[in-house]
């Protein structure tokens, strides 16, 4: 029951079968870009020479049009994002907390919790002072 299975096609046959499919994709790409494909040997062997050849005016303009279309579509997306929020919206929703003292602490709280507690208690006197000022102004405290 243990028969050795031989592959139905060899590796050389598989690579030969893939080649026409690759050439079709290559021709499609040239067709989309508007180029005339050269012989396959020119594509494979003379890549340095092709890079030195200048584009014709028609090829250059066609590529420039394609790039311009991409820029226009990406610019439209940015305009759509910007249109949702105007300058009036930004100012009406601001906190007006310009003078708030905010500190960002990064690190591992599990490694040295005492350091974080010290920083927290250092900030509390300022918060207590702000609370006293609010109460002395007669403002309502929403937490009461």
From Swiss-Prot:
Pfam families linked: TSX
Cellular component terms (Gene Ontology): cytoplasm; male germ cell nucleus; nucleus
Coiled-coil intervals: none
Gene Ontology biological-process entries: adult behavior; fertilization; male gonad development
Region (Disordered) location: 1-21, 69-99, 120-144
Function (record text): May have an RNA/DNA binding role.
Name of the protein described by the UniProt record: Testis-specific protein TSX
Organism of provenance: Mus musculus (Mouse)
